[in-house]
Amino acid sequence: MKRAILIDGNNLLFRSYYATAYSGNLMKNSKDFPTNALFGFVNMINKIMNEEKPEYVVVAFDKGKNFRHEEYAEYKAGRIETPKDLLKQFPIAYDILDAMGIVSLGVDNYEADDIIGTFARMADEDDMYDATIVSSDKDLLQLISHDVNVKLLKQKDYILMNEQVFFDTYGLKPIRMIDLKALMGDASDNIPGVKGIGEKTALNLLHEYDTIENLYDNIDSVKGKTKDKLIEGKESAYFSKKIATIYKEVPVNMSFNDIKLKDRNLTKLKNIYKDLEFFS
């Protein structure tokens, strides 16, 4: 079995930036260029490569607004603007990955999640490959399958989420994560869900009905105020499910052979680290 690692690049850079930004330790080199996100990013990439030893790697990035914003202008509207000191570090991250022999990829009108979803789908369809997704974003848990698992990053470690661990945690199949979001919403992405339905109620409903489609087909068997909330929020539930669903057909025009790990360009890498003043 050939192993592919699918890394959420935006997630890693944001995590690395805010890990020190909150404490006021932005880290800058002598030219006053911010380096804190890059420092954590490099350490994380090296850790992933050492632990996983993959043959195939892609680091996916967002590329501006995507098709979800066209359908729902308020998508992720509650998030603060990306700090300029973080934005400056993205191009250097791409250069570092290139020097490491790792493919970085962003596609117009799609999110990093969609790129990862596309490669996850490719792993599902090809018996020669399995894939591990690396991110702290629970949205990606919907991609878990027999051939795909998720290293769900925590503050100091991670949880390896596979089909069994997901079921033990939620009592559902991983794909039902989109139905869970359809009902309870997601404040971080500004996905509305059904007003008044929280995680506990949503899980109980899905344990009984499995999908929102089956739930609404059997809405008369739901009792009390929950039924009223569901009826009132039906349109929002279906819309939320659509927005929460990761798209798996991004036109990447690539196969796994195109993300095969290449030899590191040690000279280029050394020069980048020297410029950033990474000496350890």
Predicted regions and their residues:
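Non-catalytic nucleic-acid-binding/docking modules located in mid-to-C-terminal regions
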Residues: 54-58, 102, 125-128, 146-149, ...
